[in-house]
Every structure is written in structure tokens, then in C-alpha cells.
Amino acid sequence: MLGVVPDIDPEFFSLVVVPVFIFLARICDVTIGTMRIIFVSRGMKVIAPLLGFFEIFIWIVAVGQIFQNLTNPLNYFAYAAGFATGNYIGMLVEERLAMGLALIRIITQRDATNLIDYLRAAGYGVTVLDAHGKQGPGKVIFSVVKRKNMRDVEDAIHEFNPKAFYSVEDIRRAAEGTFPVTVPGPTPFSFGRVIRRGK
């Protein structure tokens, strides 16, 4: 008859439903925790505490289910597996969001004129210093870029100076700066795309 919810077998609930719930809850709270740490490092004082509230709330619910079902070893496995999976998903989300700024330092061993011209034409602020390394003269190129634009800069390095050494450092705060023009992307995770100019 419609509207009647069948009783769930207690053994099935204990052995299947509870471990699955714990697994999913751990994924959620660890993913939120990863994002909270990122927002704290970015100095976002409003979002970070809010995420912290939901993180600890979900964690308490998950731990409460374990204490109510201490005899089921699947709960412990689900707890650990959810923690590991949550870390992985959190890193994927962080990479997708690509929030904040990064300092990229490029050291070239040959002429870097084309790379420098491309970066400046694309709208990136570039500072160039003369350098001298083991294999002779070169250039050290500094640029502060939005993390969502890092792929564009790395592609340019691989195209114009494929053997150049470069390193990337996160920046918590920066004043002024020159960045490429962006337009809104089609999805919430796009956060704009770089308008690449022709070479």
C-alpha cells in the first residue's frame, strides 16, 4: 500500500547503512576541513569559521554513530576510508577552485624574449633580471599571477623555454599588480577564463 515505509532490518541497518553513513559523513567533514584551512590561509575571516561549524558538527554525528555501534568493525574501516577519501576530494576541489595568488619564478638558460613578450602581451606583470649560472648567462623572470591562470603560464614556459627551471610559491596578500582580463565562465567552478591574445 502506498505511503507505508517497510521496516528496515536492524542487522542490515547496523552492517550496511551505518558504515555507509559514517563513510559519507567523513568525506563531507574532511573536505570541508580542507577548504576551511585554505580559507584561513587566505585570510577569509567570515567563511572559515562557518565552515568550521559544519565540519565539527558532521564529525560529532559520525563519531556518535561509531560509539553507538562499537561492535561493528566496518564502522572503523568506513571512518578511516572516509577520512582518506575526503582528503583526496578536498585537494581536487582546492585545485579546481584555484583561489588566491602565486609567485612564479622562471630561470632560463637561453634567450627568453619570446616568453617575456608573450606574458606581457597576455596581460601578466613581468619583472626580468639578468643572471649568470653554471651554464652561462640567463634571465630570472618574476610574475605574480592568479592561481587559476597558472596553467596558461606553464603552457607558455613549455612552449617558448621548455628547459627553463621554474618554481611556484603561494602568496597570501599582494597590493596592486597587473593581471590578465577575465570573463565569467560557464560554471561556478570556472571563476573566469583568461583572454589570450594572438601572438
Swiss-Prot record:
Pfam families assigned: DUF2179, DUF5698
Which parts form a coiled-coil structure per UniProt? none
What are the transmembrane regions?
A: 12-32, 47-67, 73-93
Q: Which UniProt keywords apply?
A: Cell membrane, Membrane, Transmembrane, Transmembrane helix
**Annotated membrane topology:** Multi-pass membrane protein
Q: State the GO CC annotations.
A: plasma membrane
- Read off the InterPro entries from this record: DUF2179, DUF5698, N-reg_PII/ATP_PRibTrfase_C, UPF0316
Q: Which NCBIfam families match?
A: PRK04164.1-2
Q: Main localisation, per the record?
A: membrane
**Protein's name according to its UniProt entry:** UPF0316 protein Memar_1511
Report disulfide bridges, numbered on this chain. Answer: none
Q: Give compartment(s).
A: Cell membrane
* Family in the record: Belongs to the UPF0316 family.
Q: What PANTHER family would the database entry show? A: UPF0316 PROTEIN YEBE
